[in-house]
Amino acid sequence: MDPVANSCVRNPQPPAPVWGCLRNPHSEDSSASGLSHYPPTPFSFHQKSDFPATAAYPDFSASCLAATPHSLPRTERIFNEQHPAFPQTPDWHFPISEAGQRLNLGPAGSAREMGAGSPGLVDGTAGLGEDCMVLGTIANETEKKSSRRKKERSDNQENGGGKPEGSSKARKERTAFTKEQLRELEAEFAHHNYLTRLRRYEIAVNLDLSERQVKVWFQNRRMKWKRVKGGQPVSPQEQDREDGDSAASPSSE
């Protein structure tokens, strides 16, 4: 630190010539007596057209100015009156009541100020709450649906003998032949155990049946006849004829 600054700090009441120079910088007597201890330095805050750049003023450092706080306002006011071109220095002193209130707010007050001063934060918190409610509702609906499905599945298993629906194939309805149809079919079977394709077509047209119905009836009748006959094995020729008739008959379904 500068020895002059140390002297100013140690002695809060500087000698009169120095403060006289500060009060009237253009005074010749003060400059003659006060500037002997302080070298002249160019004072350049902001160079203006109406302020000479070559003017020399004493270098009053921040330490010297801070040494006597009770005399700062007066010196500053005198300097501002003599040089109005310079900007006014802001007042850095805060009211004690306001500072105390800020310190005494605590976490709760700060949170309230933040909530009141930032509506976006409050809106975001509310939006998060609504999202959580929506997610909870969706989860509850999903659980209800899953429980309902389990209940329906258990009921179906109890009613269907433990088998799920659609697993067992639906049996085809059996053809209900009339007495007249059965009589004609039995008469034809007595003459011919196997039918040609043309004869099968004629019988189907005469009895108002499909060729497949006639073919299936003759197959069932031959099986019954073989069982009644004593379980004799079917000859290869009869088997070939039956297979040929089955392959030649078109499907009527």
UniProtKB/Swiss-Prot annotation:
SMART domains: HOX. Its main location: nucleus. Residues 166-177 have a biased composition (Basic and acidic residues). Pfam families: Homeodomain. InterPro entries: HD, HD_metazoa, Homeobox_CS, Homeodomain-like_sf, MOX-1/MOX-2. It comes from the Eukaryota. One of its GO terms (molecular function) is chromatin binding. Residues 170-229 bind DNA. GO terms for biological process: hematopoietic stem cell differentiation; positive regulation of transcription by RNA polymerase II; sclerotome development; somite development; somite specification. GO terms for cellular component: cytoplasm; nucleus. Gene3D superfamilies: Homeodomain-like. Disruption phenotype: Mice display mild defects in sclerotome derived vertebral and rib bones. Abnormalities are restricted to the sclerotome and its derivatives and are characterized by a remodeling of the cranio-cervical joints, leading to the assimilation of the atlas into the basioccipital bone so that the skull rests on the axis. Mice lacking Meox1 and Meox2 show extremely disrupted somite morphogenesis, patterning and differentiation. They lack an axial skeleton and skeletal muscles are severely deficient. Heart, lateral plate derivatives, kidney, loose connective tissue at sites of bone formation and skeletal muscle-connective tissue apposition. CDD domains: homeodomain (cd00086). It is found in: Nucleus; Cytoplasm. This is Homeobox protein MOX-1. The gene is Meox1.
